[in-house]
């Protein structure tokens, strides 16, 4: 392993700071059982999230709606790509019942991309949000949405459903975006985020490190987000979920993540979650207050 400027060049062995705990305990089992009973999808499992153990022990989970097969093929993502099944009309109520059964105080929703549907799944998104709010009106909500191919009217549908936080991830810096993301552009994502921020709702985005980006590019991405008044940013280490995915270029040391957190706060973000194991929904309940 070679060390330089806070980075560890990648080989097949992960550094010690990336060791994670497997999901254990009663609350973790309860979440797992509820998900199985209602035949739900979670990004916790589909995306091989390293925080699954921590979140499930706290009785929280990020539900993935619109199926578990994505119409895009981003090189970093572990979610299967292909031709999805039709949307499940019972999903809104099933999600709402699960949120109630788990006694969640804050829920995070995300989805696969559904480019096969006329409205890319936006109306289904609204049905799920409304079902959860009707069933559990005191539960706060974050929604991590796709880009809806940049259609403002579809993004407006999500805004009008009034979740407390709307998140959309840039995923990486501008230069790497065409190589890492599938059928998505950096500028389209910024446009979506600006529309969210302009609505007055909490706007949130995130990027992964370790894909070959430079420090200057990371700071430029922060500036791009602050220019459109994005309030919350997450920064985490990219971890290759399988040999089919893009390789990790480097492992960023924890102290470098902490430095980026401080820089982000100085640039005006209300919250910056930055660490090797940070993912989009990490400590998501805090971001409602931003």
From Swiss-Prot:
Ligand binding ([4Fe-4S] cluster 2): 70, 74, 77
Subcellular location: Cytoplasm
Chemical reaction(s) catalysed: [[Fe-S] cluster scaffold protein carrying a second [4Fe-4S](2+) cluster] + N(6)-octanoyl-L-lysyl-[protein] + 2 oxidized [2Fe-2S]-[ferredoxin] + 2 S-adenosyl-L-methionine + 4 H(+) = [[Fe-S] cluster scaffold protein] + N(6)-[(R)-dihydrolipoyl]-L-lysyl-[protein] + 4 Fe(3+) + 2 hydrogen sulfide + 2 5'-deoxyadenosine + 2 L-methionine + 2 reduced [2Fe-2S]-[ferredoxin]
A GO CC term assigned to this protein in UniProt: cytoplasm
EC number of this enzyme: 2.8.1.8
Entry-linked InterPro entries: Aldolase_TIM (IPR013785), Elp3/MiaA/NifB-like_rSAM (IPR006638), Lipoyl_synth (IPR003698), rSAM (IPR007197)
Domain Radical SAM core: 56-270
Keywords: 4Fe-4S, Cytoplasm, Iron, Iron-sulfur, Metal-binding, S-adenosyl-L-methionine, Transferase
GO molecular function, one term: 4 iron, 4 sulfur cluster binding
Essential cofactor(s): [4Fe-4S] cluster
Involved pathway(s): Protein modification; protein lipoylation via endogenous pathway; protein N(6)-(lipoyl)lysine from octanoyl-[acyl-carrier-protein]: step 2/2
Pfam families: Radical_SAM
Cited Gene3D superfamilies: Aldolase class I (3.20.20.70)
Cofactor remark: Binds 2 [4Fe-4S] clusters per subunit. One cluster is coordinated with 3 cysteines and an exchangeable S-adenosyl-L-methionine.
Residues annotated as binding [4Fe-4S] cluster 1: 44, 49, 55, 281
Highest rank taxon of the organism: Bacteria
SMART domains in the cross-refs: Elp3
NCBIfam families: lipA (TIGR00510), PRK05481.1 (NF004019), PRK12928.1 (NF009544)
PANTHER family: LIPOYL SYNTHASE, LIPOYL SYNTHASE, MITOCHONDRIAL
HAMAP family, sorted: Lipoyl_synth
Protein family per UniProt: Belongs to the radical SAM superfamily. Lipoyl synthase family.
Record protein name field: Lipoyl synthase
Organism in which the protein naturally occurs: Treponema denticola (strain ATCC 35405 / DSM 14222 / CIP 103919 / JCM 8153 / KCTC 15104)
């Amino acid at each position: 392993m070679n060390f330089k400027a806070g980075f560890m060049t990648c080989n097949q062995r992960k550094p010690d700071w990336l060791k994670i705990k497997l999901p254990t305990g009663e609350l973790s089992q309860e979440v797992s059982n509820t998900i199985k009973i209602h035949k739900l999808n979670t990004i916790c499992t589909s995306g091989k999230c390293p925080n699954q153990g921590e979140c499930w022990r706290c009785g929280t989970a990020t539900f993935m709606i619109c199926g578990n097969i994505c119409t895009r093929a981003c090189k970093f993502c572990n979610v299967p790509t292909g031709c999805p099944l039709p949307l499940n009309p019972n999903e809104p109520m099933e999600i709402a019942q699960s949120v109630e059964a788990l006694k969640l105080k804050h829920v995070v929703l995300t989805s696969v991309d559904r480019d096969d549907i006329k409205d890319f799944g936006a109306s289904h998104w609204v049905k799920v949000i409304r079902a959860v709010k009707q069933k559990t009106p005191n539960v706060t909500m974050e929604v991590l949405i796709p880009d809806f191919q940049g259609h403002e009217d579809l993004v407006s549908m999500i805004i009008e459903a009034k979740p407390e936080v709307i998140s959309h991830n840039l995923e990486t810096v501008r230069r790497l975006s065409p190589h890492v993301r599938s059928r998505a552009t950096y500028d389209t994502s910024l446009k979506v985020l600006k529309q969210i921020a302009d609505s007055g709702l909490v706007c949130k985005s995130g990027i992964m490190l370790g894909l070959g980006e430079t420090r200057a590019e990371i700071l430029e991405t922060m500036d791009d987000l602050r220019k459109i008044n994005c309030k919350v940013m997450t920064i985490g280490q990219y971890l290759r979920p399988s040999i089919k995915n893009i390789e990790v270029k480097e492992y960023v040391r924890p102290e470098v993540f902490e430095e980026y957190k401080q820089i982000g706060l100085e640039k005006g973000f209300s919250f910056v979650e930055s660490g090797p194991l940070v993912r989009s929904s990490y400590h998501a309940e805090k971001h409602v207050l931003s």
